[in-house]
Amino acid sequence: MYTKEQLKKQLENMGLTGEETVLIHSSMKSIGEVEGGADTVLDAWIEYFGHGLLLLPTHTWKNINADSPVYNPKETPSCVGLLTNMFLKRDGVIRSLHPTHSMAGIGKKAAEYLAGEENNNTPCTPGGCYDRLRSCGGKVLLVGVGHERNTFIHSVEEVLNVPHRLSDKPMKLQIVMHDGSIKDSYMRKHYNADQPHISEDFVKLNQAFLDCKAVRKVTFGDAKCLLCDAQAVFEVVRHVIAPDPECIVTSSSIPKERWEALVK
């Protein structure tokens, strides 16, 4: 059984200082037994990154749609796991106003980092919260999950304007703003006619990321984890898809020649 201090030591062993901006996708079950359970996991993260910015995805794409269009950041539950919903209840945590792909954070300049998402019309709009990870030296920590849960790669594809990733027609949604007013939002969703779950193909990039040292294998609790450098991940994807922008979905595998020039 892991204690809070042991979990914090594992974060230190990853080479993280606690001053970074870190987005964590997680599976609580994969972490194993923890003294105090999920609350202790959150305590470890919040305390360790107390001088940085801790971010968790709080997506609502599963339950906010044309039939159920109203997103209320104070009430709409996250559809991406136990820890994310518990995080939303913590004092000091701020949630963005993106109606389908919100993010919550606590720490250094959290409100500033999360601001403006109500103006986006795609899941991971260039310049938005996911894309901002690149400009601040941000990391993505995948705890017990793989790149199929790495939302940052969706943002990379949006920045690089990869075709056939978004619906042509937007959904009309509504956002309950912090002051209680309602803002209409016209949101395109992830869509590919041949692959209903685009992110499942992101695992094809795993070896490229490891070879290029954009991603390292680490451990948190019992969980096998991947620690990703956002800018380095962006560069690997950019090189890999340059000859064929749709290859992550359309190719059964990606040839090593696509990333050999980046291997250090």
Across the structure, where does each feature detected by a protein language model lie?
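N-terminal basic/disordered segments at the start of proteins
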Residues: 2-9
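N-terminal active-site beta-alpha-beta segment that forms phosphate/nucleotide-binding
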Residues: 17-67
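Short, flexible loop segments at boundaries between secondary-structure elements
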Residues: 51, 164-193
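Internal, conserved structured core segments that host functional sites
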Residues: 65-155
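Acidic/aromatic/glycine-rich contiguous surface patches that form carbohydrate-binding/processing clefts
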Residues: 188-264
